[in-house]
Amino acid sequence: MMNLEEIWQQVLKQLQAEMPRASYETWAKDTQALSLEKNVLTVCARNAYARDWLESRMTAIVQNILNGILDHPVSVRFVASENPEVE
């Protein structure tokens, strides 16, 4: 069984292959997986703007990748690193 970091690295690897390089480096590269609880993966983006971009454009893609890696449905939730709940 892969740990959280390994799972997220697999997701990032696939995103890197599928996204334009500039978009990947701007939005996805610096994200971190915070937790995987009750089939919800919480991912930290560097700020609220990045969180909103990822949420609107990448949620379905990331969920599809996760479903392939984990072999069961997983939801993804993006949070911004300046949120108090993340610290």
Please place each PLM-identified region on the residue numbering.
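Intrinsically disordered, low-complexity basic tails and flexible linkers associated
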Residues: 1-87
